[in-house]
């Protein structure tokens, strides 16, 4: 077994370590929780640990002949945790790129431990499906945003489920802020096809909180932890930031435009690419492109008449792009 490296500890005695291609959280108190995992998924009591595991190509091949639950039980043994009292999430993101964010207010503390990969598997709720599951047979895609949330207070099952909704909405906010494109449609991603969330509360705490929605301070802290940790984890894993997204080419990526199409008939391709990238970074060009793309979105969502949007887009180009005509 690899040497454990401590990356996080909190006021309740929880400790998170990186080892064996995983982040393992060892709980310092008795915890109940809710998880999307196939190992002890749903609501459970008496969790002792939780883990997030990097799924290598070799292990993806292993899954072709085994269930995800069987794999997680096998991995529990490798990590030295009891499969009866743990839950595990899978991802293709590197554990070294994880981000931990903690927020506090008075006696309330919330932490999120997050990994995020969005290059391959980012998708929008309602996109065409990638597979149809029957009798447990389906395809496993790589990508994945996984979040483990820890609170120092006690939450009942309904409150944990409420927190799951808040955390999911916060994930969508993080992706929206970065304008992450879906890989399966022209829309913006709301997550990936294989995201996982696990939320744990302190069963030993006397004060039981009843709400984790957006109006509650608990919900606010959960959401802020999720938004910040996902944003930073994406930066570490795939180098997507607000700065990198401030580009015409980045904004057009959701339309599957191939940069090679821009210069296939150009003789001096190197110079053309240099000029194209410089032009793509200009704030004015990003603003023009974004304005027109927003009009397209309005039309596709039946919120704006196509002819009106077309005329306005044409006017934007005519009034702002005369230097290029």
Language-model features: locations:
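Alpha/propeptide regions of enzymes that mature by internal proteolysis
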Residues: 1-325
């Amino acid at each position: 077994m690899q040497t454990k490296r401590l990356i996080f500890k909190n006021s309740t005695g929880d400790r998170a370590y990186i080892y064996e291609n995983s982040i393992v959280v060892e709980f310092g108190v008795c915890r109940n929780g809710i998880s999307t995992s196939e190992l002890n998924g749903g609501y459970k009591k008496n969790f002792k640990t939780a883990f997030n595991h990097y799924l290598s190509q070799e292990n993806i091949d292993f899954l072709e002949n085994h269930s995800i639950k069987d794999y997680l039980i096998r991995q529990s043994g490798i990590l030295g945790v009891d499969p009866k009292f743990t839950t595990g999430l899978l991802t293709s993101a590197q554990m070294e790129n994880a981000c931990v964010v903690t927020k506090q207010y008075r006696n309330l503390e919330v932490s999120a431990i997050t990994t995020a990969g969005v290059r391959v598997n980012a998708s929008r709720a309602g996109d065409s499906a990638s597979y149809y599951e029957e009798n447990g047979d389906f395809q496993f895609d790589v990508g994945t945003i996984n979040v483990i949330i820890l609170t120092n207070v006690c939450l009942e099952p309904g409150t944990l489920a409420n927190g799951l909704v808040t955390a999911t909405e916060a994930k969508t906010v993080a992706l929206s802020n970065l304008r992450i494109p879906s890989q399966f449609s022209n829309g913006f991603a709301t997550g990936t096809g294989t995201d996982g969330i696990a939320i744990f509360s302190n069963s030993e705490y006397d004060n039981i909180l009843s709400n984790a929605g957006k109006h509650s301070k608990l919900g606010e802290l959960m959401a802020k932890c999720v938004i910040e940790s996902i944003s930073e984890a994406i930066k570490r894993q795939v180098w997507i930031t607000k700065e990198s997204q401030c580009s015409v080419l980045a904004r057009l990526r959701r339309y599957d435009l191939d940069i090679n199409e821009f210069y296939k008939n150009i003789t001096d391709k190197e110079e053309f690419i240099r000029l194209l990238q410089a032009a793509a970074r200009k704030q004015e060009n990003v603003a023009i492109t974004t304005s027109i793309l927003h009009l397209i979105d309005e039309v596709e969502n039946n919120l704006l008449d196509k002819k009106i949007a077309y005329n306005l887009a044409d006017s934007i180009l005519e009034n702002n792009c005369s230097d290029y005509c």
